[in-house]
Amino acid sequence: MYISAKNHQTRSYLPGLERINTYKSLWLKHWAEFGRVYQLKYETVFGVITEEKIIEVRKLMECGRFSNGFERHKCPECGTVLIVPFTCKSRLCLSCARKRLFGWSLNLSLVMNTLLKHSHITFTVPGSVGDMLFERGYHADQMIPLSANLFRNMLISSAKLNGKEYQPGILAALHKCGNGLNYNPHVHLAATTEIVNIKTGEIIKNVFLPYKQMRHAWKKAFLAHLKKKGIISDIECRELDDKYQNGFHVYFQPITADNKEDILFKTAEYIAAGYFHNSQIIAVDHLEKTVTFRYKSWVDRIS
């Protein structure tokens, strides 16, 4: 960003010619070498890096460069000039990903009724199951309709209602990695805990959610889905069912805030948050090629 003003007594802001941080420096310093090493050591395990992904990396590395274009804004009152470089809009870019949240919250205002009660629900699978899904090439996007339909059906059943005219509002997103950047597919739902009759507009409130039952229903539905798709055998299905007798964890968190805008932003944060943040990086050793970062660990409990 570059700012200048007609009042030369005021100290001008000196522009940074490039958007740079610790996270971005990792890509700038090591991407070329990583590409060579990946092909030799990791391509057979994780697959080919597609051209689409390479383009996203290039966008990140060139984000915020004035040479890629900029917009010039001038205040008609004081004459202050603001020059802002174009950004990459890539999800890999942490700065652009954060701005996307604001865009999401604006779009949500068109579809989300903040007068209804909402909860953030996370449908997870155990670590050992996630590892198996990765090894067997499971397409995790299939988890979205499975979890959304399960939540809807259990909410309707709990309210003792029948008919397709009764519906909760549901926004869903799949996240493929956990806080430790490990492969950990899980689904985030931002859903109403109140039910709307879409024909009459009637709102059914104070619906009891069977939280414990939801965990068992999610395990049963997901294992049956994996068996149907040929990802696991009958024997493996029974073994996993016996191993996780308390079900697969489903986390509930009410979405509350003091005003409409904060509710929208919180919802966007749950659904569209990036996988990482620069502030998580504690130390980088470019010689040893190691990164130390902090994250919150969720324990995979069986008992």
Task: Please describe what each predicted stretch is.
Residues M1-S303:
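Beta->alpha loop/short-helix hinge microenvironment recognizer with preference
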